[in-house]
Amino acid sequence: MCLRFFTWCLVCFMFVPALAWAQHPNNKAEQAIRNEIERQSRREAGQLKRAGWKVMPNKTSIEQQVRDVRFMEAATHAQSGERLYLISSSCASDSSYLMARRKADMSARDKMVQQVISLIYNSGAENARSNGELEQLPFIAENGTVTSAHLQYVVPVLECYRMDRDGCYEVLVTIRADYARTCQVINAVLYQK
């Protein structure tokens, strides 16, 4: 009994460190990626500040917003490796801050819709090519049937402004949406499922 327990403990003490050692290179690689994203986001935030961009009072700092956006761009699902978020940015000018913000937001949404349509179409074309059915690509409805209302879980993640020489507000907005759900909804609309 004692020998069995001793053998079990010996195996466990050898097996657990081996697992930890096997995961160690992954942690180093992840940390290197994390450090690179941090470095790039600090550089980009510095460029925005030097260009005169500011955030509204009571908003998160530019550094933190840029950092969050960069990590969202790199975020993937643990099992499938699929992206988690769609990211889109746009800039607009107006004499009113709210109108400039609204224009930039709508433009970013429209860009995101076109991005998703392109992703879905390219994926469908690639699947048809790999199956040897190039001339039998499925019919895709007119792009006008897909609107920004089909985007799922849209959230602004970066919002900053600057004043131009004419006294107009120039607003930069970056939004994110759920990748899988948005692609699923727009795919259903495009193929009219």
Label every model-predicted segment.
Residues 1-9:
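Bacterial N-terminal signal peptides that target proteins for export
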Residues 21-193:
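Domain-level marker for long, solvent-exposed, non-transmembrane regions
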